């Protein structure tokens, strides 16, 4: 029967993350022996965060997920769901709109609602939404995306229906295991599509970001994390602007910087403050997590795990990553 002969093809047909490398690579151990995670720490003193790259839906993925009754993404996270579930906070970049029908891939994304449900069911409990595709379906697409995310009670940052909503919900304050994390999110642009008032997209503007950082500090968080949609697509090294912004963000008080947009993996740094000895994680680009991209080095990305611990202070105790690979959709062959 064709369904048994092509079981493996069917499992890979959604162009989803298929496997992570068996061996976890420790970022901290590579750069500093002083940050091993060997100390005994009670669970309430520890916060485990997971960051993954771009969640996308190209036309091949949408077509592959179509069923007679809708869209099925249930196999999308089969091989990584357990890893996602280990995190207290699992954070991803939603780089599509949920703008409703017609569902389309590149260049103006609108994914089926079932894609968001699968993301939620996989264990992602925080989304960032400010990216160059935030306005692919204009005002209605931005608002519908936010409304659907809110309907699943997923905290999110980056785009807002109006100023009142942004003032109330931003910076995004995440409280877990006795920790308070302020999450910021910005994009370099929206592919030339202007935002329609009263909607708001968080663009990279240092004047605005500086104000947001000060507002973050006012709520006395244990850490401020900035998710930046920046850089040049398909480039494996950060550009001057990324480096400048990373330096500037940390100088202004951001503890850790997580990047996306290039669709390929870029370097990771752990910086040590020469005065306080604090450790700052900078990930220039996580690469892709779910996509149908075929350009060189775009068929995968990183899952970066960060462990914060709290005793007399809050510190970055351990950090490691896994590589992930995405399989492109394959058509079933009838025999």
Model-identified regions with their sequence ranges:
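Sec-dependent signal peptide recognition
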Residues: 2-8
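C-terminal motif of bacterial Sec signal peptides marking the signal peptidase cleavage site
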Residues: 14-15
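Acidic, metal/ion-coordinating pockets
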Residues: 19-333
